[in-house]
């Protein structure tokens, strides 16, 4: 798949961000980054979608919502502002009557259908927004959904994205002359049993099937959601059997949580750079051999878009720059 645009004499500039988790403001910033940073191509890493739905309930006496276990009273004139705030934080909302809310509590299996409905609405809105804002430009958005993203995400992107928002899961994409990008949003196993998880051997095979088709691994970019194991890009809090954070003497205990298969692939093929996310608090970069491995990090809940600019050309990685805003 060949998707590079005009290119410049100094190379092609890619803007990468990841783990937006449904944040409206972060997606708007992501689309705007093409013009702001002068990028030729936008790459959206995995975990595109939000994590939960907050009902906004009308019970006859007024409106209320539950957030983080706390009930919040809302006036009718405050609803749109609250919904916008929640959208910027990546939270989905749905207005409903008290009877409808009670029905969801009595039939929790219906919540999954509600989640997919509101998730689809936002994703379709994002794709429409990208079409509008990038109209008349050659800028494309390449994306590989992450382990937290339901499979329905792929269908929405295929159905609505056209040539503007392109699904690249499991694909090799030529992002600049002589430079291919290998992409997958699948991860190794997590404590949460999410949608797209492989054991390490299956993930190794998935990556190697793509890597074997690279024209020149040394000039490639790996776009792999989960970071390499024990790289500092994968350092996360340790969890106990109840998924509570472990501490010792008041100090947070951490451990590497990345993928051994991803690390082995980077060590074996030595691409120019590898782009990761997944562990929000482990943003940074490190060298693995000649490869510059990068976790862009994520602060989507605060409305902050963290990203990375890369310029490639002539078989070289000409620039790497972290961004935040």
What are these model-predicted stretches?
Residues 34, 38-44, 241, 262-266, ...:
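Proline-aspartate-enriched helix->loop->beta-strand connector
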Residues 2, 25-176:
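Core catalytic region of metal-dependent phosphoesterases/phosphodiesterases
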Residues 2-4, 22, 172-177, 194, ...:
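Binuclear metal-dependent phosphoesterase catalytic core
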Residues 21-25, 49-53, 139, 143-155, ...:
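Active-site environment of divalent metal-dependent phosphoester hydrolases
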Residues 11-21, 178-190, 221-225, 292-298, ...:
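Active-site-proximal beta-strand elements of phosphoester/diester hydrolases
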Residues 109-121, 221-270:
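Active-site-proximal segments of metal-dependent phosphoesterases and phosphodiesterases across multiple
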Residues 19, 27, 42, 47, ...:
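Divalent metal-coordination and catalytic microenvironments
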Residues 177-220, 241, 252-258:
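Binuclear metal-dependent hydrolase catalytic cores centered on His/Asp/Glu-rich metal-binding motifs
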């Amino acid at each position: 798949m060949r998707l590079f645009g005009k290119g410049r004499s100094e190379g092609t500039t890619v803007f990468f961000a990841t783990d937006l988790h449904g944040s409206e403001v972060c997606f708007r910033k992501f689309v705007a980054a093409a013009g702001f940073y002068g990028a030729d191509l936008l790459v959206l890493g995995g975990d595109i979608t939000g994590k939960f739905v907050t009902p906004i309930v009308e019970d006859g006496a007024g409106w209320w919502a539950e957030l983080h276990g706390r009930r919040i009273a809302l006036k009718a004139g405050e609803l749109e502002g609250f919904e916008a705030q929640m959208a910027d934080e990546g939270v989905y909302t749905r207005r409903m009557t008290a009877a409808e809310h009670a029905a969801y509590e009595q039939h929790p299996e219906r919540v999954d259908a509600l989640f997919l409905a509101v998730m689809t609405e936002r994703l379709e809105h994002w794709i429409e927004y990208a079409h509008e804002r990038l109209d008349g430009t050659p800028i494309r958005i390449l994306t590989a959904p992450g382990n937290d993203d339901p499979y329905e995400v792929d269908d929405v992107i295929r159905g609505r994205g056209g040539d503007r928002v392109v699904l690249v899961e499991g694909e090799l994409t030529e992002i600049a002359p002589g430079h291919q990008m290998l992409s997958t949003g699948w991860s190794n196993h997590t404590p949460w049993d999410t949608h797209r998880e492989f054991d390490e051997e299956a993930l190794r095979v998935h990556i190697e099937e793509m890597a074997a088709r690279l024209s020149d691994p040394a000039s490639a970019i790996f776009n792999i959601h989960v970071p390499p194991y024990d790289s500092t890009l994968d350092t996360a809090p340790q969890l106990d059997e109840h998924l509570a954070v472990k501490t010792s003497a008041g100090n947070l205990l951490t451990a590497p949580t990345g993928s051994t298969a991803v690390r082995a692939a980077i060590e074996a093929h030595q691409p120019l750079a590898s782009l990761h996310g997944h562990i929000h608090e482990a943003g940074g970069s490190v060298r693995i051999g000649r490869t510059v491995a990068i976790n862009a990090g994520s602060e989507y809940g605060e409305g902050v878009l963290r990203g990375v600019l890369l310029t490639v050309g002539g078989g070289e990685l000409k620039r790497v720059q972290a961004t935040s805003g």
